[in-house]
A protein has these predicted regions:
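A conserved structural motif in NAD(P)-dependent oxidoreductases
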Residues: 88-99
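Short C-terminal tail/terminal secondary-structure segment
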Residues: 26, 104, 115-128
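Short, small/polar-rich loop/turn modules that mediate ligand/substrate recognition or access, typified
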Residues: 13, 54, 59, 114-116
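Short, flexible catalytic-loop segment of classical short-chain dehydrogenase/reductase
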Residues: 25, 60, 64-75
Length: 128
């Protein structure tokens, strides 16, 4: 999709925002290799795109949320959900609105000098 949008992005000095995962930067659960590999590749792609598109005024950033309280995680055992909450200083899971807020900020004029970054939306669970 990004490749198809390149001419318009360059012309408009647009924004590319990818949604990765905090799982790509920290310890993960057993059997998550395909998911973590894909999200890690997305982070690398975003940084490379930031280098390539920066001279055209296009910013490229990633958002890496921790566990987001959606239907997608409803099948995760409650014990695992609570373990995540207990490791998070804000003592809750992320919401879709938390992730959307990060995207709105990165898409806004206030983020015009932010590129090649990975914004963690983890409630402090993955402080670096």
């Amino acid at each position: 999709v990004t490749k198809a949008a390149l001419p318009a992005l360059k012309k408009s000095k647009g924004r590319v925002i990818t949604i990765a995962s905090a799982a790509a930067i920290g310890r993960t659960a057993y059997n998550w290799l395909p998911y973590v590999a894909a999200k890690s590749a997305l982070l690398a792609m975003s940084k490379n795109l930031a280098q390539e598109l920066g001279p055209h005024g296009v910013t490229v950033n990633s958002i890496s949320p921790s566990m987001v309280d959606t239907d997608l995680v409803s099948n995760i055992p409650e014990r695992m959900r609570q373990m995540t909450v207990s490791r998070t200083p804000l003592r809750r899971l992320a919401t879709a609105d938390d992730v959307a807020g990060a995207a709105l900020m990165l898409a806004s004029p206030y983020a015009s000098f932010i590129t090649g970054e990975n914004m963690l939306v983890t409630g402090g669970e993955h402080m670096i």
